[in-house]
Amino acid sequence: MVSDDLRRELAAPPAWMYPFELADGSRPPLLHHELPSVHETRALMMERVVQDALEAGDGEPTAIDIGCSEGWFAQRLASWGAAHVHGVDVRDVNIRRAKLVRDHYGVDPARITFEVADVLSLDPDTSGTFDVVLMIGLIYHLENPIGALRIARGLTRGLCVVEAQVTEQNAPITSGVGVTDEYEQLDASWAAKFEPAQDFHPIASHGGVISLIPNLAALVQAMEVVGFRDVIVLEAPSGHNRQYVNGQRRMVVGYA
């Protein structure tokens, strides 16, 4: 049975990020037709390493989904073995939808909790640490992606999974070094993109900012610099979403 509140949310803008299958067989209207393939590929790429990290934790394993949107991956984390999952997102509408869908599926609200919060406001001293931290589709919408990764590192006691759109700037960039006619070659680089207000760009995590988009070298470098060890780039199997197979989007994991 689909509640009246959920039906109203399904009929209201903006369109949804995740293709939840509801009890009556219906699905929300999506922002883009490719999204189901994107999410399926993401889940396939991370499931095994996430399960391993949850199994390796002491006591009841916990996870946090930073930039959780409507809570699809928060629910996956629970199905993969997390005893408690906390989802945070900067948008009220996303958290409202996440709670409605959680309740629709009959999930204990104490097992999957949701909170409206900015990633930069999170503090391990108050929230604690987690066996698994997800940052899926987030950092390339931020003005301070490295600061966000530092916070993610502080929250991680096991594994952190970061997924991002990346640039195709794989050749080194030439930069001056402060001396006339002297230069250095830098493998890591970030592209700047203006994100319009959220009302006009519903996929963006936060509108009205200059977002920084890394190339793969910059993403790996940032993970290492903020303190993750054994940083690994996960590869997508052939036959799955081409953005991942072709390297337009990458998934990187690091350990505490």
Regions found by a protein language model. Name each.
Residues 37-59:
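Conserved alpha-helix/loop element of class I SAM-dependent methyltransferases that forms part
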